[in-house]
Structure formats: structure tokens, C-alpha cells
């Protein structure tokens, strides 16, 4: 899969956050987006996922235009900062909600959930509520949930925030396993060391402009 971004522009009121953004993302790479707070990194992810609109430009998935505020949930997914799990639903219910809503056969969805949860070592926690999980466990639940529609590219918003070193190591391993299975990733992070560790490319948003570097 290939995401193409052409001449994208986003403003909040009179303030232009970024403009003239031209990028491509593919499902065989991990790309990190770095930059100071307030540079519009998370907003960019939300635009790609159809959660916010942009002012001008084009976003296309494999050549198919995605109008502002729309997306294809079977091609791109997102793991939010803070995970956004439903507190009154069990882990199992959280994970099955999206595929059932999107019309995936219940039995198929349950089999997929079990397989993914076992791969990420979270299956034994399936009957618990989010409040009873550690931060790392909640994140793995959020990753499984985001993978349930089998997107080709998965976005992460500040995935290392509030995680300890050992949990960050497990996250890096999880991302590498997903990449080996053919899933690309776009990762917003302030953690420079983590970005260098996982990324094929690092993008920097600075004062509305974009700079790119290749990670050796």
C-alpha cells in the first residue's frame, strides 16, 4: 500500500500549522515524525485517519483520493496517546467492537482477536477492565484493537509516553514483528532514541515546513 500526500495545508484560525507538505508512506517501512510541541504532528496523523479535515491538498491511498475528513479503516489504523479504551468494557469487548461494527463475521473476529492477543501476550487479560491493566498492557490492547481490521499502515501517537524502559523495549519488538508481517507504521514521537531505533525514515516538522532524514 502507498499513501500519497500532496501539497497539504492545515490552519487553526489565522495560524498556518503546516503547508506544502508532500510525502509518501508505504506498508514496508516505519516512519517517525519528530518535532517540538505545537508543530501539528498529531494533527497530521488525525488528518490521515480522517479524524480532522485539512484546508488544501490531497491524500490518496493507492491512487484513490480520500476527501478531507474521510479514510479507509481497512487500510489505515491508529493507536492513540492514552489508548482511548472504553473503561466500562472488558478487554475482549474493546477489541471486538470495531470489527463487529464494520461487519466482520463474529466468529472470524473472535479468531482474529485470539490470535493477535496471544501474539502480543495479552490474551490472559481478556476478561479484565482497562483500569486493572498496566500502561504497557493497555497499549498492547490498543494495538490489537487497531490491528483488528488488518490495516496496511498503523499510526502511533506518542507511544513511549509514560512507559518504562523495559516496556519500551517490548514495544519496539512488537513494532518490528508487525513490520515483518507486512504492516507499515507512522509514529509521532518526542523520543529521539526510540525514533532512531525503529525507523527507516525520520520526518521533522519545523515552523510549518518539513525536513527528512534517512536512518542508517
Per-region residue spans from a language model:
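Conserved structural motif at the start of ABC-family nucleotide-binding domains
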Residues: 3, 18-20
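Helix-to-loop junction immediately C-terminal to a conserved catalytic motif
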Residues: 49
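A short, proline-enriched helix->beta-strand linker immediately N-terminal to the Walker B motif
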Residues: 148-152
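The feature captures the beta-strand-to-loop junction immediately N-terminal to the Walker
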Residues: 34-36
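Conserved ABC ATPase signature
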Residues: 129-133, 137
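Catalytic Walker B motif of ABC-type/P-loop ATPase nucleotide-binding domains
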Residues: 154-157
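Conserved ABC ATPase "signature" region
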Residues: 107-124
